[in-house]
């Protein structure tokens, strides 16, 4: 064993660059898988900690003018563990720039926050005339501790001012850059003064037993009704669901696909290198076999280096993967307001890294090593050199007919076929890298195209809501504004169909602002209390068809309708757990909810739909209806927020493609270096007869370009299949997507593949150019 170890270490020392490339390939493969596993575990732990935390409210009830002291009455319920009231207000804030949205919570005692407790990460809690902001608010506009910001209800109201005393992290609150909204905290008295209403408007309850939440909710509502306090229906927390869980799961699943691709490429790299080592040392293997060495004794001679590289690559890959996974988990956790648990290295990550590293190292090496030991000693001891097959093969005959090409280019094109298996493996590595690029670009394009299509379904420029329920006929008042060319009162709420949560929408039958794409049947008619339309994804999920009866349940009320049509609309929002939509008239939706003929919000279209035109029109609308404290969401802003969220997916997938491409580059460089090692004598002869360094660089670059071009051909086929798979996978996790693949992506992939292949070939070309002829010719 001492001799074997000595030989192995000597081989590593002699072939430093090859060994480094081999090690790098395994490190990248292991690191990718470990990073994904580490990220998934930490995010899952952070979500469990946040949503099982003693700080999280189990029950939220919107109230109006909740008096101080009534918490003690609610606290008497045996299932109420803690109860707090707060006041919140949607405002706009500015630090010298454009006004942006902010949700301000008013807290009575910052030293004794028991429910939904934010973490102070800089500065101090605010006093009178002060406020703190979530740290991610700095991504919306520059703001620092000590700055004085302006706050206003709308453009029609005079601003108030607050000094920033610190920054917080809000549990479970998505990043401000995703929501396009900041989150802040201020003394409750200040927020009540800004609202010009006494009392609180939020009731937060922590329960002893979550399974009794509905019973406790009804008991609290009886208390509120008895005292004449207006309130909403209440929301019970689902500890199994967190904002962004579905989206994060889809992202990690897609990234896992690319990490597996990286592992496969690492295996190709090890296989290629071990095959080259066996071809180089055929004579040594023959000598060992001739003096009586068994196949196992010879085999372990070549498996030990693979074992060492596998162990070292695994350990280094685990370290890199944990570091990368920590950065990735921190980034993703910050986007949805999750604080990561303290650093821990789970045994499964160590085991996973070792299994992959050793599996790739030994598993990929054992086949070429075993194949090499199958040859008899006599065949191994024969001269293993160049065969007289010039012009014999099809490719050689084809190249011989080329005219107008340099000798070096022709030689480079011919040389890649001297080691066919090695070249094919290298083409596969390059092809997988090209396929990964095509797949991600197709996924990005499909997501963007689908989002564009979904937003095109809505012809509204903005959505308006007010501080009180408004009758659907309020559209007549809105029509008096000369900027508004169309307005409709819409209803939206949660409902259940066959125990499946869905979105209930009330939209006028003659709507002009919802461009329904009916795929089967028709749109519902006005004044028909029994007709509904469902989305295609809800129909697929529940097996619904046109003409089927449909029972819709809203809390304790339910109504059976007839499905008259199916529309293609899979638009959703961050954190949504609903499947599809059910459309009916606003009258029918309000009847189901047991409410008056009211609208939850109004869809409006302006004469000028440009962002500047929409902003100007909204300012005038807010001024005109300032008594109702209008809140507006511009459609272009909502679309921009969605695109910002999708951009995160694109950036992270592109990062994984870079990792895959890096392995492909390493594989190409490794192949060319192996070729140089085997052809030192030829290269020395070329130098001795006058070939310059530039000619040898051109020779290697031409080989790399040919390998890249052929790999690109493989990548075209594999890329289309991978693109289809990724789009289908993402569609199953998020929303159904329209497959989009531009010919320009295929052209760009080809150009990038050739450029990268040529660039990766320069370094081996320089090594070839630096060979001294006398040393190269002496090489045995």
List each language-model region with its residue ranges.
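Membrane transport/envelope proteins' first extracytoplasmic loop
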Residues: 1-264, 276, 295-296, 454-458, ...
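N-terminal Sec/SRP start-transfer signal
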Residues: 1-30, 303, 391-432, 701, ...
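Short cytosolic juxtamembrane segments of multi-pass membrane proteins
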Residues: 2, 374-392, 769-780
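Interfacial "coupling" helices/loops that link adjacent transmembrane helices in transporter permeases
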Residues: 15, 268-310, 667-705
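Juxtamembrane segments of multi-pass membrane proteins
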Residues: 59-64, 405-528, 533-537, 545-548, ...
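Short coil/turn motifs that cap or connect alpha-helices
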Residues: 144, 294-295, 376, 545, ...
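Small-residue-rich transmembrane alpha-helices
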Residues: 267, 271-274, 308-339, 348-374, ...
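C-terminal transmembrane helical bundles of large multi-pass transporters
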Residues: 489, 599-605, 617-620, 624-723, ...
């Amino acid at each position: 064993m001492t001799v074997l170890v000595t030989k192995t270490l000597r081989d590593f020392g002699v072939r430093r660059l090859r060994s480094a490339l081999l090690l790098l390939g395994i490190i990248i493969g292991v690191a990718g898988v470990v990073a994904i596993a580490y990220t998934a575990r930490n995010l899952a732990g952070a979500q469990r900690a946040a949503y099982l935390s003693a700080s999280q409210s189990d029950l939220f009830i919107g109230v109006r003018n909740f008096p101080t002291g009534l918490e003690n009455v609610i606290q008497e319920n045996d299932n109420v563990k803690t109860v707090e009231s707060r006041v919140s207000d949607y405002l706009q804030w500015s630090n010298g720039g454009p006004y942006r949205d902010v949700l301000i919570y008013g807290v009575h005692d910052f030293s004794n926050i028991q429910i939904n407790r934010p973490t102070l990460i800089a500065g101090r809690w605010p006093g009178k005339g002060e406020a703190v902001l979530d740290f991610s608010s700095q991504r919306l506009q520059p703001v620092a501790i000590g700055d004085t910001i302006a706050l206003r209800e709308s453009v029609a109201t005079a601003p108030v001012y607050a000094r920033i005393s610190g920054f917080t992290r809000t549990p479970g609150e998505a990043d401000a850059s995703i929501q396009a909204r900041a989150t802040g905290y201020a003394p409750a008295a200040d927020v009540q003064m800004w609202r010009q209403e006494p009392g609180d408007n939020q009731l937060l309850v922590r329960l002893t037993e979550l399974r009794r939440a509905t019973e406790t909710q009804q008991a609290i509502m009886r208390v509120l009704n008895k005292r004449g306090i207006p309130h909403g229906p209440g929301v019970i927390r689902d500890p199994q669901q967190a904002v962004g869980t579905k989206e994060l799961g889809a992202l990690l699943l897609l990234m896992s696909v690319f990490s597996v691709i990286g592992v496969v490429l690492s295996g190709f790299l090890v296989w290629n290198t071990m095959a080259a080592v066996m071809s180089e040392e055929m004579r040594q293997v023959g000598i060992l076999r001739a003096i009586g060495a068994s196949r196992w004794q010879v085999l372990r001679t070549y498996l030990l280096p693979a074992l060492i590289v596998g162990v070292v690559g695994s350990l280094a890959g685990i370290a890199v993967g944990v570091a990368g996974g920590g950065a990735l988990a921190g980034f993703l956790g910050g986007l949805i307001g999750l604080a990561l648990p303290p650093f821990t290295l789970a045994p499964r990550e160590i085991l996973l890294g070792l299994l992959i590293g050793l599996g790739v190292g030994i598993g990929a090496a054992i086949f070429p090593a075993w194949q090499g030991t199958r040859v008899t000693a006599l065949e191994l001891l024969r001269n293993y050199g160049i065969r007289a097959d010039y012009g014999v093969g099809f490719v050689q005959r084809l190249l011989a007919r080329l005219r107008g090409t340099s000798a070096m280019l022709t030689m480079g094109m011919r040389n890649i076929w001297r080691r066919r298996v090695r070249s094919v493996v290298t083409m596969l590595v390059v092809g997988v890298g090209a396929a990964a690029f095509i797949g991600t670009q197709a996924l990005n394009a499909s997501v963007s195209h689908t989002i564009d299509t979904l937003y095109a379904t809505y012809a509204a420029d903005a959505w308006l809501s007010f501080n009180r329920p408004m009758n659907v006929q309020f559209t007549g008042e809105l029509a008096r504004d000369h900027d508004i060319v169309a307005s409709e009162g819409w209803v939206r709420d949660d409902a259940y169909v066959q125990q499946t949560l869905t979105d209930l929408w009330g939209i006028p039958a003659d709507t002009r602002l919802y461009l329904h794409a009916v795929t089967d049947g028709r749109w519902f008619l006005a004044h028909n209390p029994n007709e509904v339309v469902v989305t295609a994804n809800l129909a697929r999920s529940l097996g619904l068809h046109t003409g089927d009866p449909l029972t819709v349940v809203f809390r304790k009320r339910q109504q059976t309708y007839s499905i008259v049509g199916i529309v293609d609309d899979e638009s959703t929002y961050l954190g949504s757990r609903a499947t599809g939509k059910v459309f009916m008239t606003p009258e029918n939706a309000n009847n189901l909810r047991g409410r008056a003929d009211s609208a939850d919000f109004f869809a409006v279209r302006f004469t000028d739909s440009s962002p500047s035109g929409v902003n100007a029109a909204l300012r005038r609308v807010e001024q005109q209806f300032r008594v109702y404290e209008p809140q507006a969401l511009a459609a272009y802003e909502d679309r921009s927020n969605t695109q910002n969220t999708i951009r995160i997916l694109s950036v992270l997938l592109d990062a994984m493609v870079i990792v895959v491409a890096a392995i492909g580059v390493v594989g190409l460089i490794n192949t060319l270096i192996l070729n140089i090692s085997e052809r030192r004598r030829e290269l020395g002869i070329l130098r001795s007869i006058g070939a310059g360094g530039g000619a040898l660089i051109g020779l290697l670059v031409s080989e790399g370009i040919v390998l890249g071009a052929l790999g690109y051909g493989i990548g075209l086929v594999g890329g289309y299949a991978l693109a289809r798979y990724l789009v289908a996978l993402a569609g199953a996790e998020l929303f159904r997507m329209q497959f989009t693949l531009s010919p320009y992506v295929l052209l760009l992939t080809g150009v990038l593949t050739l450029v990268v292949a040529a660039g990766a070939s320069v370094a081996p070309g320089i090594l070839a150019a630096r060979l001294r002829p006398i040393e190269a010719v002496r090489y045995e």
